[in-house]
Amino acid sequence: MIKAAATLKSLQYRQNSLTDCYGRLSFGPVNPGQGLTIGNTLRRILLNDLPGIGVIGAEINGVQSEFSTLPGIRESVIEIFLNLRELIFTPTATCAQKVKQTKPFVYAKLNSELKIDNFPYVVTAKDLHIPEYEFVDPNQQIATILSPTAAENFKLTLLIGQGRGYQSWKKLPGVPQLMDQRFFEQFDSTQTNSKSVTFPIDAIFMPIRQVNFTVQEHSVDGEYIYFEVWTNGSINPFDAVKSAAKVGMKLMTACLTTLQDQQVYLDESKLPETPNFVQVNYNKMESESNFDQIFIEQLELSLRAYNCLKRANILTLADLSQQSFRDLMKLRNFGQKSADEVRAALSTYGIELKED
């Protein structure tokens, strides 16, 4: 049994470019046989479960097909969309918490004050106006404008969201409903001679590009795990491994709470006075409920129910749990069918509507 506490250490850090970071880390000592289990778990979490930010929809002035070409623009529409998928974001320090709590999606538009004097002009990430996020690489290319007429007509609107891994837009919470509602702003008729179409984009949210690990035995200390982590620059490798460990702890704590629920037949007189590990973590999870981070888009409600709640500023599961049946029935266009949908959705999270 290893008595020394395991620690995470950064052994090497290298930034090859703004969007390519490399880190080598060690974790240990751990007991013989545990290195492979811990290393494989953290590797899978790093590749699959860390959140990221990406472009999930785009609208270009006058474009009705992704196979179109734009007069005076070097790239085709498909090439522009592929460039948009490569944009990497990080929340600004002042807006990170606000965006996390209240804005599952945000807009980005081409800066209206952008003045182009020389052609060809390369439109880059820094030409977009988006106060909620920062670009990891402000010089990431989007499109090339070849003429003043093209510069005047080129209008771009993006929808940016958060997620994990690679996700089709059809599976992103709330996005299909937003597309059905024509969520994007339509440009003024004086700015366009034809109708614009909103194009969903399958986003790549993964901040981790690659992870390797090896386990080495030390005759005295036990096993050490050595990680090699490559990221896209939105997070450094050391913080990425720490975040992965937190995700793993949260998952395991959920398993422990299930075990705690199964101990109802124990003789309470024989339980220790000091709360055990399971009880402490169960109480902690109850007090740190994340219902305020679950948005109503994730409940997969009908469009009518979703719109009614959105108009009433009921944005999260926490907001919804504070409503009673009578409160919901007072909402405009909210009927019995919508109420039944909400009840069913809440039941999947183990909560009910507030008592009248």
UniProtKB/Swiss-Prot annotation:
Residues 1-259 are annotated as: Alpha N-terminal domain (alpha-NTD). Its main location: plastid. The keyword Protein biosynthesis does not apply. The keyword Transferase applies. It is found in: Plastid, Chloroplast. One of its GO terms (biological process) is DNA-templated transcription. Residues 277-356 are annotated as: Alpha C-terminal domain (alpha-CTD). The N-terminal domain is essential for RNAP assembly and basal transcription, whereas the C-terminal domain is involved in interaction with transcriptional regulators and with upstream promoter elements. Belongs to the RNA polymerase alpha chain family. HAMAP family: RNApol_bact_RpoA. This is DNA-directed RNA polymerase subunit alpha. The gene is rpoA.
